[in-house]
Amino acid sequence: IKNRNKKNFIKIFEGAGGLLVPIENKKTTLDLVKDLDIPLVIVVGNYLGSLSHTLSIIKNIENYNLDLINIILNQNQDDSLNINDTEILLKQSLGKKILVRKILKNSNYKSKEFSSILSDIIKYFNL
């Protein structure tokens, strides 16, 4: 896997439950991502505590020297928090080093939000 051509080796891997979920013998999903040497797209919810959780996982990603393509802020059906406020706080905390995209609860795959996310991934792989 280490000697692959990025343009010919794009795979999607979903790590449900978070990057620190144990998978075997003290290994986590984050360890697997490091071993596979794959970039990340992180999907986070818009809930009380999501900012802290997101910043914590980014610190772990940085400590593992992994590439992060972007963060997707996902609006929940029962959102009581303003997703725009969460987006602003994330962007202020991260600066311009990491792209933050949001997906509204009524978005579909043809929406501008999904196009932006796909564009980020294509740009990362120089396609």
Model-derived regions: residue spans:
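Anionic group-transfer/hydrolysis microenvironments
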Residues: 16-17, 47, 76
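Inter-motif core of Ras-like GTPase G domains
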Residues: 24-47
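Class I SAM-dependent methyltransferase SAM-binding "motif I" and its flanking Rossmann-like core
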Residues: 50
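Phosphate-binding/switch loop-helix module in NTP-utilizing enzymes
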Residues: 1-23, 30
